[in-house]
């Protein structure tokens, strides 16, 4: 039996965090290519530091003649992404930073296996769901995201003009009988523009927004608040710390509450099972919990490069289900085609829906009308039940 009484901590980072900025650039490039060619193959990495962005990786297009045309748009895509995030600092400005593009054509040896509908690489992928929030996500990561998303809204609307784009949050939640009941500590480090602002000044700005998104009963007189605990946080973003695509994989997923296969998501087209199979695993786990078959569920999938069918499917419900895990494994494998092509088609992944995933979590988001976050739907519930 899993522990019922404990304190668990998760962190999130804002869209202006250097690593998240790079994730968004990588996914903006991916979206631009998928918008023109749904069969585009993309593996795009970005690196950002003071005044500079470097983009590299591999792309493959159905019409190779258009490769040069797309290459000419990369710098503009990167600048627009940086502008949207809000970087207009002296040493990192969307309009003046140097953008170096080293993207090149994808290896034919990689593409040949994928062209036969096999997986784009070997690997293991995990999906997770738990009934402690309406989104069926772990509460610490879900609310750590919510804090930063709300503060970004306030900054971008002009309501809080002294806040900068770079920020991090961290929540420690105390659980009783397996349910979150109290925030024991709350950490927020938020970039600001005025060097004269103190930690107390920043807390006065951010606290109303934090209280707006958190359940009121979780904040008690015992909750420790740590807002900009080091003091001044004016130098931020890539000018303060270099950023790199794919370095926030725990922030992107479940905040450490579930295993991670190690593969990052951003910049990868959906033939890459690092991304698409992780989305499918979340979809399956969420539908198992939504079906009432378990209060908590993790699903693992594994693949080999060039091989279509998953090598293994594993489920664990942590003692919260009356249905044997082996039966759940069989049911989910029958309810959905888990080949890479089957996943792409079932979740309609070959479209420009990825930049929005690159900040504030890939999971626990509301499905969009245009097909974004399709893996958050609970439309597989009846199919899974029929297979049991």
Curated annotation (Swiss-Prot):
CDD domains: S-AdoMet_synt. It comes from the Bacteria. Its cofactor is Mg(2+); K(+). Pathway: Amino-acid biosynthesis; S-adenosyl-L-methionine biosynthesis; S-adenosyl-L-methionine from L-methionine: step 1/1. ATP binds at residues 17, 166-168, 241, 247-248, 264, 268. InterPro entries: ADOMET_SYNTHASE_CS, S-AdoMet_synt_C, S-AdoMet_synt_central, S-AdoMet_synt_N, S-AdoMet_synthetase, S-AdoMet_synthetase_sfam. Keywords: ATP-binding, Cytoplasm, Magnesium, Metal-binding, Nucleotide-binding, One-carbon metabolism, Potassium, Transferase. It holds the Pfam family S-AdoMet_synt_M. Its EC number is 2.5.1.6. It is found in: Cytoplasm. GO terms for molecular function: ATP binding; magnesium ion binding; methionine adenosyltransferase activity. Coiled coil: none annotated. Residues 106-116 are annotated as: Flexible loop. Mg(2+) binds at residue 19. It catalyses: L-methionine + ATP + H2O = S-adenosyl-L-methionine + phosphate + diphosphate. One of its GO terms (biological process) is one-carbon metabolic process. K(+) binds at residue 45. Belongs to the AdoMet synthase family. Homotetramer; dimer of dimers. Catalyzes the formation of S-adenosylmethionine (AdoMet) from methionine and ATP. The overall synthetic reaction is composed of two sequential steps, AdoMet formation and the subsequent tripolyphosphate hydrolysis which occurs prior to release of AdoMet from the enzyme. This is S-adenosylmethionine synthase. It comes from Paracoccus denitrificans (strain Pd 1222).
């Amino acid at each position: 039996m899993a522990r019922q009484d404990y304190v668990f901590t998760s962190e999130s980072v804002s869209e202006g965090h250097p690593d998240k900025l790079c994730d968004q650039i990588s996914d903006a490039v991916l979206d631009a290519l998928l918008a023109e060619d749904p069969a585009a193959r993309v593996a795009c990495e970005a690196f950002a530091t003071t005044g500079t962005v470097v983009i590299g990786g591999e792309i493959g297009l159905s019409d190779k003649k258009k490769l040069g045309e797309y290459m000419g748009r990369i710098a503009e895509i990167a600048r627009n992404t940086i502008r949207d995030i809000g970087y207009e600092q002296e040493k990192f400005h969307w309009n003046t930073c140097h953008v170096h593009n080293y993207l090149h054509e994808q290896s034919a040896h990689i593409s040949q296996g994928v062209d036969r509908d096999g997986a784009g690489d070997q690997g293991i992928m995990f999906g997770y769901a738990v009934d402690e929030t309406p989104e069926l996500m772990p509460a610490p990561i879900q609310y750590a995201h919510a804090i930063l998303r709300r503060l970004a809204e306030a900054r971008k609307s002009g309501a809080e003009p002294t806040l900068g784009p770079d920020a991090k949050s961290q929540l420690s939640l105390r659980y009783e009988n397996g349910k979150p009941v109290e925030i024991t500590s709350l950490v927020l480090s938020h970039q600001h523009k005025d060097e004269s602002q103190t930690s107390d000044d920043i807390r006065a700005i951010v606290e109303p927004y934090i209280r707006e998104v958190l359940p009121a009963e979780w904040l008690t007189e015992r909750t420790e608040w740590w807002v900009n605990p080091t003091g001044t946080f004016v130098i931020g973003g890539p000018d303060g710390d270099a950023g790199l695509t794919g370095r926030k994989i725990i922030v992107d997923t479940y905040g450490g509450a579930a295993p991670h296969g190690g593969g990052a998501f951003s910049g990868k087209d959906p033939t890459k099972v690092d991304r698409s199979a992780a989305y499918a695993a979340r979809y399956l786990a969420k539908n198992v919990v939504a079906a009432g078959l378990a209060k908590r569920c993790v699903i693992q999938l594994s693949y080999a490069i060039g091989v279509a069918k998953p090598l293994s499917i594993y489920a664990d419900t942590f003692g919260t289900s009356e249905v044997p895990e082996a039966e759940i494994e069989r049911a989910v494998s029958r309810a959905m085609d888990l080949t890479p092509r089957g996943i792409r088609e079932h979740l309609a992944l070959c479209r420009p829906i990825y930049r929005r995933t690159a900040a504030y979590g890939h999971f626990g988001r509301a499905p969009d009308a245009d097909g974004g976050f399709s893996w958050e739907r609970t439309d597989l519930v009846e199919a899974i039940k029929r297979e049991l």
